[in-house]
């Protein structure tokens, strides 16, 4: 099995789950754009590949997958999805990606929010702009400085490029007591840094409240297996604590989104408070159970070894309250 972006934060847990599947031995092939990927050490074979946005990425992945005789390809990074999806019919093995249209509408946050509003799903008010002048106009339209707003690139992954515009931010406190990379700043500071033109930006109402996600496996029209979970204890842009939830309303909302977008294989839908803020048509952090191995089940489905009905029959195994605590680890080797 080939796992892309094998330097991603969840890689070690994912690889362990794929190996510890209780059915068979699995040979793992990792790829990453970084030479310092942990996949180099945790996989049975490793290949340094171009970035997912590089035009040569699909051909390189096809070459690696063919040379290694893998049975399936599991992408971890949002940046790998579209390049693979556009060439999926060239691969002799299953590639666990959604159709190109579903990926594009999910990764373009403006299109995502437009869809949410059309479906009646709560999502932030927003403006799609480019350049400092556009950000300034949109921020004031959304209520700045009376209330904080936020922005991020239309095309991004996770918290990359996300900033909160807050006129009350204590810059002295940030300077003296916070780690570098604080996400809050004043509008005028952002305007000094932003060029005119440049990438499209999404200026948004700031969603507040607890974070939750719905994760699972979809069949292009509905969720066949999945569950909601909390997303807590942020550190360096990553959540470090997750608790499985029993929330039928969140599952209903996720089913509506999955069906409208036509998502296939793995998905992750993220909420802050009541607002949907992100749709990721890929695998994300998993709360693992010894009797419910979502990544392995998703791969089995792609290989035709388990049916959607058989996956639906596993839904009662989801254990609300099951908790995952993420932590930092390290390994040593002689260079």
Predicted region positions:
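ATP-binding N-terminal substructure of ATP-dependent carboxylate-amine bond-forming enzymes
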Residues: 1-99
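Phosphate-binding site of ATP-dependent enzymes
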Residues: 175-259, 273-275
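Preference for protein termini
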Residues: 1-31, 69-72, 76, 128, ...
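Short, charged, surface-exposed secondary-structure boundary motifs
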Residues: 40, 56-60, 104-111, 159, ...
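Active-site nucleotide/adenylate-binding loops and adjacent lid/helix of ATP-dependent enzymes
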Residues: 103-201, 220
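ATP-dependent carboxylate activation and anion-phosphoryl transfer catalytic cores
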Residues: 68, 233-237, 241-335
């Amino acid at each position: 099995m080939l796992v892309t972006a094998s330097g991603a934060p969840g890689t070690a847990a994912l690889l362990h789950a794929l190996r510890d599947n209780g059915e068979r031995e699995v040979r793992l092939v990792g790829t990453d754009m970084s030479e310092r990927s942990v996949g180099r050490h945790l996989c049975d074979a490793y290949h340094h590949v171009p970035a997912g946005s590089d035009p040569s990425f699909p051909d390189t992945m096809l070459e690696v997958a063919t040379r290694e005789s893998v049975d399936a390809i599991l992408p971890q990074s949002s940046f790998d999805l579209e390049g693979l999806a556009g060439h999926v019919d060239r691969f002799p093995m299953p590639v666990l990606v959604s159709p190109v249209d579903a990926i594009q509408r999910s990764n373009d946050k403006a299109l995502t929010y437009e869809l949410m509003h059309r479906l009646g799903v709560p999502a932030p008010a927003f403006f799609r702009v480019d350049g400092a002048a556009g950000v300034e106009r949109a921020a004031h339209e959304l209520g700045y400085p009376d209330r904080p707003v936020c922005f991020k690139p239309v095309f991004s992954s996770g918290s990359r490029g996300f900033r909160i515009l807050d006129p009350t931010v204590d810059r002295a406190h940030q300077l003296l007591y916070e780690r570098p990379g604080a996400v809050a700043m004043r509008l005028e500071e952002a305007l000094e840094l932003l060029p005119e033109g440049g990438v499209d930006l999404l200026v948004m109402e700031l969603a507040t409240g607890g974070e939750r996600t719905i994760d699972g496996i979809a069949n292009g029209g509905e969720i066949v297996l999945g569950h909601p979970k909390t997303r807590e204890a942020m550190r360096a842009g990553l959540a470090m604590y997750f608790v499985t939830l029993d929330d039928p309303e969140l599952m209903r909302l996720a089913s509506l989104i999955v069906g409208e977008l036509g998502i296939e294989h793995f998905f992750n839908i993220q909420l802050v408070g009541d607002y949907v803020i992100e749709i990721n048509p890929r695998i994300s952090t998993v709360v693992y159970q010894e009797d419910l191995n979502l990544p392995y089940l998703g791969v089995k489905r792609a290989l035709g070894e388990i049916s959607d009905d058989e996956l639906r029959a596993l839904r009662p195994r989801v254990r609300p309250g099951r908790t995952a605590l993420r932590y930092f680890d390290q390994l040593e080797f002689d260079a």
